[in-house]
Amino acid sequence: MSNHDQLHRYLFENYAVRGELVTVSETYQQVLNNHDYPAPVKKLLGELLVATSLLTATLKFDGDITVQLQGDGPLKLAVINGNNRQEMRGVARVQSEIADDSTLHQMIGNGVMVITIAPTEGERYQGVVALEGETLAECLEAYFRQSEQLPTRLFIRTGESEGQPAAGGMLLQVLPAQDGNADDFDHLVQLTNTVKSEELFGLPANEVLYRLYHQEEVTLYEPQDVVFRCTCSRQRCADALITLPAEEVAQMLEQDGNIDMHCDYCGNHYVFDAMDVAALYTGNTGESEQLH
């Protein structure tokens, strides 16, 4: 049995290093649903999904992380948002043709990576860094180095499993306030770098870890499910509508007869007719919900 759509945390007993392993298939497919992305964009979204899952698992508080790539290339934006419950959503915006063999930098052009950490309670933090590195994993590792965080390495794979898109990855991180040996960390990095896509996608986590670290003492903790979950709702759309000037809303109604608000993340449509809009301004959004 494989470990699709689960995140696993593990700890090396003899080293000051922690690890994570995640694979996603159903969640990945749901991110791709309702969109006709070019192959390199699909791959990048899979990598972003894995990276965001691994990063949110490092949070010591309730909240979410958004990893966003943006630039002036044919791929204007690619973003994944996830929280400490491993609830993920994501979207990409393509503005011109992308060749099947396009690299990260060819897609993004001159761009940056924006990482936003938003605790449920407390201050929001945002880091903006140049895209240094040929791959997403290398760019994220550069982010960790620049922000003087704990030594961290990521290993990300994408492909297919049982005819479905699949992505997986691993993270190694030195434990805080530990006198770790750099050679020990490098040793574990070399072992982890040998992980194959088919192992991540097709084997249980304990077997993957045994194949990689069979000479090490590793503690594997209970897994956490990874799911696709969009936070859109009719109420959120109503709240957004009510902030617009009344004249603009009236113009939209006059033009189309109703206002159709579309969620890029999940594809849901929220339709407001004239009566719905009138109810917004009287403080009653009503109970009916139209989804198409």
From Swiss-Prot:
Q: Is Zinc set as a keyword in this record?
A: yes
Gene that this polypeptide is encoded by: hslO
* Role of this protein: Redox regulated molecular chaperone. Protects both thermally unfolding and oxidatively damaged proteins from irreversible aggregation. Plays an important role in the bacterial defense system toward oxidative stress.
The UniProt entry, under CDD domains, shows: Hsp33
Alphabetized, the UniProt keywords read: Chaperone, Cytoplasm, Disulfide bond, Redox-active center, Zinc
GO biological process assignments: protein refolding
Any one cellular-component term (Gene Ontology): cytoplasm
Summarize the PTM comment. Under oxidizing conditions two disulfide bonds are formed involving the reactive cysteines. Under reducing conditions zinc is bound to the reactive cysteines and the protein is inactive.
Q: What is this protein called?
A: 33 kDa chaperonin
Is Cytoplasm one of the keywords? yes
What organism does the UniProt record list as the source?
Answer: Serratia proteamaculans (strain 568)
Alphabetized Gene3D superfamilies for the sequence: helix hairpin bin, Hsp33 domain, HSP33 redox switch-like
Matching InterPro entries: Heat_shock_Hsp33, Heat_shock_Hsp33_C, Heat_shock_Hsp33_N, Hsp33_helix_hairpin_bin_dom_sf
Q: Which GO terms describe its molecular function?
A: protein folding chaperone; unfolded protein binding
